[in-house]
C-alpha cells in the first residue's frame, strides 16, 4: 500500500470550521460537488477556488471528492440521475454538513 493510500485511510472528512483562519470550510465542503459538477455560478466558483488555493485541508477533501466522482463516472457512465434525486441529495448533504458543523 502506498503512502498516499495509507493517508487516505487515516483521513476523515473535515466537519465544521476546522481551521480558525478559514471559518468558511464547512460551507466550502458543502459546495464542493457543485464545483465538481460545474453547477455553481461563476462568482461561487471563483470563491470556492480561491478558498481551495488557501486551505490545504479543503483542497485535500476536494481531491478525494474528485476521485470519487471519476470512479462513479467510470462505473456508472451513461445514466444520469433525475433532477429531483440530485436536488434531494444536495439538500441532504447540506443538512448533514450544517448539523455536524
UniProtKB/Swiss-Prot annotation:
The keyword NAD does not apply. Changing residue 55 to A: Decreased inhibition of SigH; reduced interaction with SigH. The modification Phosphothreonine is found at residue 96. Keywords: Iron, Iron-sulfur, Metal-binding, Phosphoprotein, Transcription, Transcription regulation. GO terms for molecular function: iron-sulfur cluster binding; metal ion binding. Phosphorylated, probably by PknB. Phosphorylation decreases interaction with SigH, probably leading to increased SigH-mediated transcription. Iron-sulfur cluster binds at residues 25, 51, 55, 58. Its cofactor is iron-sulfur cluster. Induction: Induced after heat shock (50 degress Celsius). Part of the sigH-rshA operon. Residues 1-20 are annotated as: Disordered. The keyword Iron applies. Binds 1 iron-sulfur cluster per subunit. Belongs to the zinc-associated anti-sigma factor (ZAS) superfamily. Interacts with cognate ECF RNA polymerase sigma factor SigH under reducing conditions; the complex is disrupted under oxiding conditions or as temperatures rise. Binding inhibits the interaction of SigH with the RNA polymerase catalytic core. A redox-regulated anti-sigma factor for cognate extracytoplasmic function (ECF) sigma factor SigH. ECF sigma factors are held in an inactive form by an anti-sigma factor. Overexpression leads to increased susceptibility to diamide. This is Anti-sigma factor RshA. The lineage of its organism: Bacteria, Bacillati, Actinomycetota, Actinomycetes, Mycobacteriales.
